[in-house]
């Protein structure tokens, strides 16, 4: 799982950036004697972007709506309202939108809806569907065919070459058929596809009749990043399916699966249920996305995470730390020696990524919609 920007090749990969093993985890002040009158300082957590509950506006809306009876399975008025908000946001009035319980379920459902039973999905080696979905895609009958990652991204020329090799193989009738392409925005390393890159990938996909799927588990952090030159409408124009992540961007849980050109398969509700992605109390998802997409709340809270990450990134650079991967979003990857890991993780939760050949650890610092200025200042002081 190496990046083209990484100076060292990992000797043993422990995990990828989407889910991590946390290290340490007790604040040093929590070990104070029981007789001490000073309260223990709260543990700093920069482990991931799903450690907090939900934005207060969502909790208020859920509380206000708590005793309103509604029909189930996403057939309610609030899911319809959230769907219309998404359609306006992406400038696709006929888009088919479903609210699903989580990211793995969403990816499994989307791929199974798009690919034939013998179809495979093409992804880079570091892709979430290849590394951290416990074989969910394969369990639904779809092989994951991998290409090299380049700072977490897919090269369109390598995708075209893979298709050429498959088409030229006289035995391809006996092989899993490349049937769709999966990428993430932002990537597992927090990097971004720029508009030219995504357009190039989309061109190859359409020339080969391969639906393009964009995993947007961290879409808010991508679109809000200073280096992002695309909009949600651009993604809807270039992709055949994508998700709008809620779990990692302010919601309690849930992802919106969006098909800009309409439903990809008949009886989608049955397919969604088959993959364990259908929530009986579907309005709980609708309420959350209705709030997130009202008055730009989704992007506003994502900007906070990116701003906090930018401040940490500058501090790391100023202090001479080696940052790996050219992320401009809420994920920062830094190579640390064992002593520094021990010192920092005695005071703050970080994510362990992998062990590098030179013995250092690749650690992730991850901000979220809920990260405060004070938390960022306290982390920087520890560096």
Predicted regions and their residues:
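PLP-dependent enzyme catalytic core of the Aspartate aminotransferase-like
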Residues: 2-6, 10, 21-23, 29, ...
């Amino acid at each position: 799982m190496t990046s083209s920007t990484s100076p060292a090749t990992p000797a043993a990969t422990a995990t990828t950036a989407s889910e991590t093993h946390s290290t340490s985890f007790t604040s040093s002040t929590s070990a104070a004697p029981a007789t001490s009158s000073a309260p223990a300082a709260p543990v700093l957590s920069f482990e991931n972007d799903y450690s907090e509950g939900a934005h207060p506006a969502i909790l208020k809306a859920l509380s206000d709506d708590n005793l309103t009876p509604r029909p189930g399975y996403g057939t309610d008025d609030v899911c319809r309202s959230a769907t219309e908000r998404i359609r306006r946001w992406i400038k696709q009035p006929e888009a088919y939108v479903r609210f699903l319980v989580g990211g793995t379920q969403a990816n499994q459902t989307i791929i199974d809806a798009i690919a034939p039973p013998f179809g495979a999905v093409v992804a880079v080696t570091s892709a979430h569907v290849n590394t951290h979905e416990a074989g969910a895609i394969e369990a639904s009958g779809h092989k994951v065919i991998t290409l090299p990652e380049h700072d977490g991204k897919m090269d369109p020329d390598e995708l075209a070459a893979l298709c050429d090799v498959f088409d030229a193989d006289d035995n391809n009738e006996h092989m899993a058929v490349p049937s769709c392409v999966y990428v993430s925005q932002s990537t597992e390393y927090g990097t971004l596809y720029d508009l030219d890159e995504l357009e190039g990938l989309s061109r190859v996909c359409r020339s080969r009749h391969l639906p393009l799927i964009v995993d947007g588990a961290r879409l808010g952090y991508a679109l809000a990043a200073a280096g992002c030159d695309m909009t949600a409408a651009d993604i809807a124009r270039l992709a055949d399916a994508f998700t709008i992540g809620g779990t990692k961007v302010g919601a309690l849980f849930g992802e919106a699966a969006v098909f800009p050109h309409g439903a990809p398969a008949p009886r989608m509700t049955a397919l969604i249920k088959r993959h364990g992605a259908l929530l009986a109390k579907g309005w709980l998802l609708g309420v959350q996305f209705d709030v997130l997409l009202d008055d730009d709340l989704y992007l506003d809270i994502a900007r906070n995470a990116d701003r906090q990450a930018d401040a940490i990134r500058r501090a790391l650079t100023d202090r001479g730390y080696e940052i790996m991967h050219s992320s401009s979003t809420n994920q920062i990857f830094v190579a640390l020696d064992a002593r520094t890991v021990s010192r920092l993780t005695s005071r703050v939760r970080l994510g362990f990524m992998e062990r590098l050949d030179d013995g250092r650890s690749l650690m992730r610092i991850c901000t979220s919609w809920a990260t405060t200025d004070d938390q960022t200042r306290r982390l920087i002081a520890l560096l």
